[in-house]
Amino acid sequence: MKPKIISTNQLAKICGVSQGTVDRALNNRPGINPKTKEKILSAAKTYGYRPNIHARSISGGKSMLVGVVVFDLQNEYFSGLLTKLEAACRKKGYATVVMFTHKNPEREQECIESLYRMYMDGIILCPINKGPEFENYLHSLEIPVVTIGNRLETFPYIGIDNFAAMERATEYVIGKGCSRLIYVQPSLNTGHNTYAQEERLRGFCSAVNKSGVSSSVLHWREVQTLAVTNEKTAVICSTDLHALRLLSIAKERGWSILGFDNISMIDALGLPLDSVAYDTDAVAEAIARFLNAGTAGDVLVNHRYISRNSV
């Protein structure tokens, strides 16, 4: 973890001087005792202070810029949300600056630090990092941060209740008479922030435990090796992309199949795949409101089951 970014206000507190005195020292202005100046410059070096150039230029006013940090655009959730988020922010007078982490923790911090230097009024973050050290780092920026997709404990979250959405979807599948459930998900043993996937798995397990049906949790490639039984089987996938990989196999074997995210490709190609959809318009509008207020609590948006007769 990189050292936390220190502000001029924090530097002033460390040195026991006013913020104006710190400003004079850092900008080589007159009216400051040489020893005090030396003390401030030394502390700035020790604590890794770096100037926020844009903040100087607007003299404490709003930049009307919002930073967005997501994995990439391969996930349709992000591409669809970004389009709506840009429109919602533009209505409020904000311009968006988008950066991609490609699920690399170090790259994520580089993105955040770059946005800090541009003096964002807020950062919308789908985090790959997690834990107290990372959250303390974010708090040290003194910029409003809201999370999407994955959650951080001490920051607001805007999105769906992944646990409830998957629990209800699984209950629906069980209600259709399926007694053998196969849950398909990506690996969660990465050491990264996989909150959304963890919550979906937890929702699946909750529904299974209440019903008593048999179940297994597999990688999508493992599903191809499963034996066909007389049990009514359903494959429940934590993403539509996993479900699309298994759609033909499920059809061949007479299995039900369910995805999650309701990506546009399903309707565009007329694919028979049930999925769980959620309101990205509501997510975008909630984020825009957060930017205006500067603070926010969690905002959970609605989800719904989309039936296309694959269950």
Question: Where are the model-predicted features located?
Answer:
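N-terminal helix-turn-helix DNA-binding module of bacterial transcription factors
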Residues: 1-63
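N-terminal helix-turn-helix/winged-helix DNA-binding helices
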Residues: 2-6, 45-77, 81-83, 92, ...
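Short, solvent-exposed amphipathic alpha-helices that sit
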Residues: 39, 77-91, 165-168, 194-214, ...
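Periplasmic-binding protein-like
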Residues: 120-126, 180-185, 189, 231-242, ...
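Flexible loop/hinge segments that line or gate small-molecule binding clefts
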Residues: 126-165, 188-189, 241, 261-273
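Hydrophobic alpha-helical segments within soluble ligand-binding/sensing domains
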Residues: 158-183, 222-226, 243, 277-296
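An alpha-beta-alpha
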Residues: 169-213, 298-311
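Flexible loop/turn connectors
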Residues: 227-311
